[in-house]
Amino acid sequence: MSALDEVAKLSQLTNITPDTIFSVLRDRFYAGLPYTALSDSILVSVNPYASSGNRNSDDTLREYTSDYRQTNKQLRAATLPPHIFAHACNAYFYMRRTGQDQSLLMAGDTSSGKSEVRRLALRALIDLSVAPPGKKGSKLGVQIPSAEYILEALGNSRTLENSNASRFGKYTELQFSDSGKLVGAKTLDYYLEKNRVVSAASSERNFHIFHYMVAGASDEEKQYLGIHDAASFRYLGQASRNMDTQDAAKFDRLKLAFKNVGFSKRNVASICQVLAAILHLGNIEFHYDRQRTQDSATIRNPEVLDKVAEYLGISSKSLEEALTYKTKMIRNEVCTILLDADGASDHRDDLAKSLYSLLFAWVNESLNEKLCRDDFDTFIGLLDLPGFQNLSKGNSLDQFCVNFACENLHRFMLRSVFEKRRDEFADEGISHLSPEVPYFDNAETLRLMTNQPGGLIHIMDDQARRMPKKTDQTMIEAFGKRWGNHPSFKVGPADRSGFSSFTISHYNSAVTYTSENLLEKNSEVVSTDFVSLLRGNPQESGKLRNDSSQSSGSTIPFIRGIFNTKVLKTQSHPKNDQTIVAAQQSVKPMRAPSTRRPNRGNTIKRTNTIKKADDDDSDEDAADAADASTSKKNAVRCVAGDFRGALDLLLETLEDTKTWFTLCLRPNDNQLPNQFEARVVKQQITTLGLSEMSRKLLNEYSVSMTYEEFCQRYADVPSLQAVQMRDAVSGEAKQKFSAARQVMSWSDQEAVSGRVKVFLSHTAFRELEDELRAADAEEVKNNEKRAQLDADAAARGESDPFSPVAVLADDYTRSRSNDFVGAYGDPFKERSSVALPLVGRGAAGNEDDLEEVKSQYSGMSGTLARHSFVGGLSGAPSFVASEAYAPSRNMFADMGKNGLNEKAGTAAFTEEPLGEVAEEVGVSSTRRKWVALTWAITFWIPSFILSRFRSLKRPDIRMAWREKLAINLIIWFICACAVFVIVVLGNLICPKQHVYSPTEFASHKGDSSFTAIRGEVFDLSNLVASHKTIVPVVPANSILAYAGEDATPIFPVQVNALCNGVDGNVSPWVQLSNENSTDKHAQYHDFRSYHIDDARPDWYYESMWLLRSNYRVGFMGYTTDGIRDILSEGRAVAIYRGDIYDVSDYIKQGNQGVLRAPDGFQAPANTNRKFMSDAIISLIAQNPGKDITKQLDNLPLDPVVLDRQRVCLRNLYFIGKVDHRNSPQCRFAQYILLALSLFMVAILGFKFLAALQFGRARKPEDHDKFVICQVPCYTEGEESMRKTINSLAALKYDDKRKLLFIICDGMIVGSGNDRPTPRIVLDILGADPNLEPEALSFLSLGEGSKQHNMAKIYSGLYEHHGHVVPYIVVVKCGKPSERSRPGNRGKRDSQLVLMRFLNKVHFGLPMNPMELEIYHQIKNVIGVNPSFYEYILQVDADTEVEAMSLNRFISAFIRDKKVIGLCGETALSNAKASIITMLQVYEYYISHYLAKAFESLFGSVTCLPGCFSMFRIRTPDTHRPLFIASQIVEDYAENRVDTLHTKNLLHLGEDRYLTTLVLKHFGKYKTIFVRDCKAWTVAPDDWKVLLSQRRRWINSTVHNLVELIFTPGLCGFCLFSMRFIVFIDLLSTIIAPVTVCYIVYLIVLVATANGTVPLTAIIMLAAIYGCQAVIFLLNRKFEMIGWMIVYIIGIPIWSLFLPLYSFWHMDDFSWGNTRVVMGEKGQKVVLHEEGTFDPSEIPLQTWTDYENELWERNSARSIGSIIEAARAENKSLGSRAGSQYAPSLYGQPMLPHNASFGHSPSPSYGGTPSQFGAFAPGPGSQIGGSQIGAGAGYFPQDAARQSTYSIGGGYGGQAMSMYGLPPSSSFGVPTGGSGFMPQPFNTTASMYGYPQQVAATQSIYGGSQLGFGGGFATAEQQQQQQQQQQAAGLSGSGGSKSPPREAVAGGLPSDSQIKLDIRSLIAESDLTTITKKQLRAKLEQKYATSIESKKAFINSEIENVLSES
């Protein structure tokens, strides 16, 4: 035995120091001995970073298992060196011999080899305990290692420190029967590092399985999964470029492992498909495209989105919405957060992490379902946690939790070694054998982290639960405040990212953690969008889905299954159980560790004892109980707290086991073999406390028992038979032990005697137990069988198939896969499907197979088992043999075209989506005609080609695309027509002529000198230069002398060179005439033949060719008058083909030429002087000045002769062309364009005159009309909305007569906002943040069930700069089941909320609950009857209104009763924000002062902007409804918006369409522009936003034009009505691109030097902009001239690019889920996924009926409370006719007593009397301000059911309003002639619904200045008053109808009250239909008694009221 082997244990070293331990470890390391024993229960392992030779081989394992089986002491004398195999064998030995559960714990730094040591220990235990081949449980020998390999592939990755680092904590329990046979296994996972899925560090890898799959999948599988190129996946990072060469082989091994544990092929394919979906998910890119959506990001690569959606079994649209929107529960309301590109990327990563972590949990639970047993006896647990982490880039929650686990484990080990048996040893009196050793105790560090309350984890969790009030910074402050003085804690400065940090001194080292997003990570939740999208909402059997939000989930059952696991905790909406509002994946394992009942301590199991049934082990799922309690207390489960709880439970379990520690060391930091660095190893020796533990465990006793137990157990041991120990008790037993100790020669180190117990070391215990084992015949037999099996395996040379050093050649894994199953054979081989068990069964076909049932160690429910583990994706049980597969086989081979989808794959999303609803709608004839025209225009584009484009899959979208193309073609045709008219038509009618009249020609002298030669005009100015070059002797002046002159005489011609005569031959001596030129320069150009000294016959022709090519500018032109003048001179001229010929000389010479021979020569006598045909000459002579074209062409001449004669005419006699420029057709062509131009300029001129207003804005008088200021809000910022609300509050108008009506369109958190928009609005208004009114139903716009919407109503008073204005806030929150953008239906729907309400108020129509509550709030809380309001001021949430605007608007209405709507000037508040806004300043200005001012002259402003306009609700005289007329409301509320036209009208330009409807239905009324009213709005400052805005504006303009065309009176008289002008104006929008092109043409024309300047066009353009400049000057808007210049520069953008872009993107909007197809008979079938809408879901009731019911009940409760009461009443009594609302699913309140809209649970709001004569809320309320006084009649017990804002009463009759007046007599309707004086309070309900006393002092508003006298009532007074009221029948609680409160003894109210009621009824009635009889009937019904005695009085009063109105 070597010296190294003699070192038995470190604890036995003579000098135990870190240095000596280091020396021993180093020497053994270099000797190839990585294992060293510290004591019997602690093993030290040094990671060799290389194969350990045969130290971990199967042969070595057999040596140690053989040693375990060996019971002969002599044969075991050669002790084997320490090894993990021996460690595992010892644990198994103790479990078998003591019956006590064991645990093997691996501790150490990362990269110290813990995972491999754990695998080896597991392997040894399996080898010791697995059943022999062919026996039940034999396949566990393959299945458990396979399961371990699967989890390793899913949970391990390559890091910088370790190539196979565990990224989760793994605790595995091997389960054994009482005979020690392995029967099952259970693995618990602790804290998977799921962030690695999306953000692995540089040079590190993602989880192994991704790389295995990408490298090892077959080509077919890669094709199916789309994973060809690993480097293309963002989630694989740079590490994908350095793929492990063994990854491919490991993937085959992984598939084999899945097969071994019983996973079906579909299961494995599904897992790979999810992994592929995650990889592709990481490649989805986002960009901030604000053209499509207002604030959210869009997908940049939709093809990747489609692929991911297909793999996940969902639609692409649903996935896109889930990625770009985020649903969050804020204050009990589901809100949607619009994500920008960064937010969407983070959300995408969250989905990837959630998918992977849930997949991991599902796989682990599946393995547990297949392997875990319930009926086991003992277990051995193996724990491996990730190593300690301290990152350089910053540590966060992941590192905190991992280090906390390491800290906890280290503390557990220290407690086990140093403290666990301290008290026991002291009690037994053997403390001297276990000396106290000082050691570094980390208990304080652990207390710092876990103290309850106040520990770091507790603080972290508490702060996370209170977000957003608490932040990372407040958490750090809390840390410092609580632990600032702790030695292990320090708050550090801000890190590099600017976030605070804190440092914890761990046992290993100090680690600094950043606080960045720590709270957010600690409260990490799974997005409910993803859960709802992929899991779906379970539906009750047999019920149809009628709600769009109830998603059916993924079509792939596997995807639904992983989201249905127990690990995912969900929270449902309080009002809808099927709506998930919160989901979290617990970091706790799905199962709990196995625990024992009490009495399972360190007692020894008796031999040969049979356990009774009541002594069976049991498991307790303590985690479930903890989870249940936690979920009740806190909705947010925090990661750190959950993890701590899981660890505590685990350590509690380990506390009950016998623990075996393996301390793993890392020899160096570089993962290099054969390197043992002193610094690294010594640091770990010190950290782990090896020297201290070695000294402590000098004497280690493994087993203790009483003396009686010792004697009883070992009485039959052969070595101790002489001692005779049987039946020894008490003192005798102690003596017997002493004797036995002497017999066995044990020292104190091996066995020691205590006070009542015996303590044995491992050596002594093994020695005694071996003798017992040797005497056990059954164990001897089993050991012999096992030894034979080992021998057979050794002979076959089998190896560990899952060893990291195993052979991984592809041919090996693919061809010899059966060898991997080990000595136990393939458990699935030669098994028929009949004999095979279901997937997940434990045994394989034996008759005595144990049935696997759910383990009670697991908390998994049966539901989960049924949902998740019933055999693959099909949902049916799967047999292994039927779906088993070879690793090399394509796992997707049999999936078919639909893949893993449950239904028809992705076709399900394009053809028949689940839950789709079909509705048939009619098609108008106009629509049919337009569709026919569209097809006629676009027939040449086949539909099958369009359908190949991703965005044109649906037929209705393709049809819209065709419509867009058709419209574009029509627009382009109109533009082409405009071009034709401008450019082509003139030339077509009058072709352009390049001719000059003699006058024009003569004028060309000087710089532009022209000259003429034989009718052709040349540019003499340019000719001079070239002539000077050729003939320099001739001065330029001599040449320029011919400017404007005919130069023909100086260019003599040679006749025979230019004319071939009649017969083709002309004598050279023949000349044109005998005339000699008198010009001296002619001689220089005379080269005729008779100049024999220099004859050049062709010189003239050549010169003319040169001149024509370079200098000709035209021809001489002669008009008819000019030709007549020539004829008057006796010249013979004629016109041929537009050319004028003069043959006068030829005729004068006798129809022939003249002869001229050279000097000294005579011409031949027979020379023929004729060269022209006599017939032609005769024709000219006979037709002087006429056109002889036809006659000449018809002459009987040979064609050759005729051609010669034409040439002769052209060369010799041409004098010019006929000038047609003044002909009628040319005049027409000229003046038609001028007329059109003048017409357009005239319109501009009228606009100019309209804009000329010299009057000064005067201050209007104060008016008393009631006005509603409507403000729709969507996602605007807080600052914008605050400015708008403040500007409306500050309007110089009576505050009591204006109402802020704010509609919040959905619970949406806009980009850049930290709260949902409704919360921002309410915070601005100062509403009570604790106020939670119930949501009430109303009818909304939307498809299907989305028409049922819900809203909350808030009301109060808003105070700003001395103004106190009442407000109503309508918060559209949607039904509880809505997830995406709850409540959001668009701006049009927000406008309709008020329009529909006012329409129903006017006509007294039944109202829905929301409208009734609005009515109540306005009438009974604010104190104004809704029918009093006459005007609606519409203002956008980003607009500020000038203070005097409202008064001026109303003045305009009052001046002209025909005005139905008007607008003011809207300027820019951000004019200089960017170049984009600068371009818009001038355009905004002229759109008002030119366009709208001009239209206003005709009373037809065609576009009243929604941002700043005002409408008249009804006519002032006849009370006819105008803006709220039913026809306008019905048209504007069009719900079917499914065509291109309606989309552009109602989705892109709703404001303009509203104006169109007003003009359409009320053509005789006016819409005007009021220049004195001004507002400021925010213009787009980004190019993309501007592009989107103008696209919507331009397209809506075009489509509104189509609507206006059919407006009656459009044509008017002679097409000169205003609407024709509007048509021309709108038409100019279409041809705007042509206008720009024309302007560019003009500019080019002007810039061209030789171009003629179009003076008229330039003058008109100058006039256009000059007039505008005049307007600016007159209005002193000097800066506008500069803005005009900026605008002119941007004309190409406004008039060219934007229109063209807009026209082509006319169909660029969201189409939603609605599809339109054609039915069988041609009808239109609308398909959508929004479910069906049942109108009966929304109850309706008239206000009168509702108010009567309230009278009957004498209740001031809100609508919600009444509905709740009705529901309860209906349940008990059944429904009854005429009752209040029927029960509504969405109308019920959360709590029965919680009244709507401001009901306070306590009387905290009644304490201070307000200035309005009632009780004002406390500090910070929305009412504010108070006066001195006290109130009477204050009853606290009733305060809970009163409205917080019901200042002055509720429903109880004439309730006091906010201003202290009875609502029906408020503001303008005097009560009994007393004006604003209040009525006696004995007939008016108080604030809380009780009669009030007469006020002592009247307030300015009619209430009590000093409150309601009398002070607060005492308890006795309250009781007395209540009794009196009950006696009078006023409480309403008795159930019977009680008389109205104002009733007097005689049964009828007072006359004054009757007058008030008459006025109220008349105000609510339609005067065109109401009669006196009907009014009396209403009064009689109201008073519930006969009114005959008052009939005359009532009739008289009715007439008085009508006469007043």
Swiss-Prot record:
Compositional bias (Low complexity): 1917-1930
Membrane topology: Multi-pass membrane protein
Every DEK-C domain range: 1948-2003
Coiled coil segments of this chain: none
GO CC terms, sorted: cell periphery; cell septum; cell tip; cytoplasmic vesicle membrane; myosin complex; plasma membrane
Skewed-composition ranges (Acidic residues): 615-624
Membrane is among the record's keywords: yes
Glycosylated residue positions: N164, N364, N390, N546, N1076, N1650, N1770, N1794, N1882
Family matches, as InterPro entries: Chitin_synth (IPR004835), Cyt_B5-like_heme/steroid-bd (IPR001199), Cyt_B5-like_heme/steroid_sf (IPR036400), DEK_C (IPR014876), Kinesin_motor_dom_sf (IPR036961), Myosin_head_motor_dom-like (IPR001609), MYSc_Myo17 (IPR036037), Nucleotide-diphossugar_trans (IPR029044)
Domain description: The N-terminal myosin motor-like domain (MMD) supports exocytosis but not long-range delivery of transport vesicles.
Function: Polymerizes chitin, a structural polymer of the cell wall and septum, by transferring the sugar moiety of UDP-GlcNAc to the non-reducing end of the growing chitin polymer. Involved in mating tube and dikaryotic hyphae formation and required for the formation of invading hyphae during plant infection.
Protein name: Chitin synthase 8
Species this chain originates from: Mycosarcoma maydis
